[in-house]
């Protein structure tokens, strides 16, 4: 069996690592660098350049030089964040036939996994050159807050690059592995604050010593998959464009060549300002007009840069707060803070983290290499070369299905340790319903419509039965890569149907962030909605069971009783259509009161309960483990 390499597929830079003789080795690329720019260029002669060579020619070939493609992976074209990116990058982002965001180079449309695969190929070749043997297996890292479709797309990129992706693991978890392997014995809790080129993640991780084994358990994770060093660069680029416009009256944003030079200069200035108080951005011949060539020369102080990006740094603190709350611990319980990602070298970021957590971050973890090193350790664990490490990661968002009344019923809560498998029994909403539609959702809201739809599938050929009698078992299974598989089974017939969530149907980061923010802000609204939906379902069930009881009773019900019951039923049906929970509760009580004498009369006359009454009893009063589900009936037209 060959070596399993660890790859950090980053937004700005990528890195490859291997475990050799018990030590983790970061492998230098052909240019002698330990990290490779995540940049791909398509030359006019058809050559594909990757890494430093692509970066060097970017100024002369801006339209065909692709960078930060990871921000597009697993995303829809119409997402707001993609539309924002279109304004900022010199290359062309286009809408694919499946509505995904793709890029166009030399008239050819390409999917982000296809482009990311070129970087992975470079990483694979780097490892092969070093090892002197073929490499076919890898562990690839992704931001902890990547959703299902983004993980799937990353796996696809690996497959395109000729790699069997043995595991997708979360970047902060990988960094904790790299940090925790050589630590002294004993338990400790760490925060991994990962601010990379395009994404931000924070994870609370408990590292425990159990019978000589290092156990890494992720207690909670949070983040923002569209916040990173690229956004800091954009702020600086915008500032430089504005300064140049004030001075010359010319807008550089329409000039791809000038913008590419500005991007490089802004990135360089940002890096310099981490160690200097001031720097110059000097770009001669940036553009020209009728009066001649124009030069850009702007002095930038560290204080100026900090004022431009202060709100971006502050945006990282709320996810930290939520992660601590979800983990059920306070700041005082944190033993160490680990900074990962090149952007954490910025003094303002370090100060903000120190102020929030009340302790200095550790400096013994290389922010650019820790993630790839952790991936290599996980690769060695999977290969059986490392036996004393156990990694317990989590699913970042709640997963469930839509049930009766437009409610999202959760099957797997957020921050559940993966891999995991959960099942729940649901039933039908109508008598003789022949098929159900399973609507899979991801998000934190109680109202199904407020969450993201991941997919739908049908389970057909359910034998005719009263509503509430069929037993439909829905199973959610998240594998160790965080990828979701959903299945449904009719327990009576054994018929099953399943779905793997496809790569083009995932959540956008803004939606995820918004869901959790909304869930925090609207928890009271959600609670009221849930109570109203429960009351409506109770009212519907009572109407159904009462009408059935009256029909079964036949002439045992007097005309007066029938009239009173029908009036109460109509009143309850009207109340259920409204939004007043108290009114529904009152009408439920009223109908229960007027129908009680008939129920008592029938009970008294039935010395022996009829065997056939069992399904009715079960549909009238649901068993605790059966949830009413609003499934669509699929008509079979023959």
From Swiss-Prot:
Induction note: By stress conditions e.g. heat shock.
Keyword Phosphoprotein included in the entry's annotation: yes
Domain of life: Bacteria
Keywords assigned: ATP-binding, Chaperone, Nucleotide-binding, Phosphoprotein, Stress response
Pfam families: HSP70
Residue(s) carrying Phosphothreonine: 199
Region (Disordered): 605-638
InterPro entries: ATPase_NBD, Chaperone_DnaK, Heat_shock_70_CS, HSP70_C_sf, HSP70_peptide-bd_sf, Hsp_70_fam
Compositional bias ranges of the Low complexity kind: 605-617
A single GO molecular function term of this UniProt record: unfolded protein binding
Phosphoprotein listed as a keyword: yes
NCBIfam families: PRK00290.1, prok_dnaK
HAMAP family, alphabetized: DnaK
Function in brief: Acts as a chaperone.
Record-stated family: Belongs to the heat shock protein 70 family.
Protein name: Chaperone protein DnaK
Protein source organism: Pseudomonas fluorescens (strain ATCC BAA-477 / NRRL B-23932 / Pf-5)
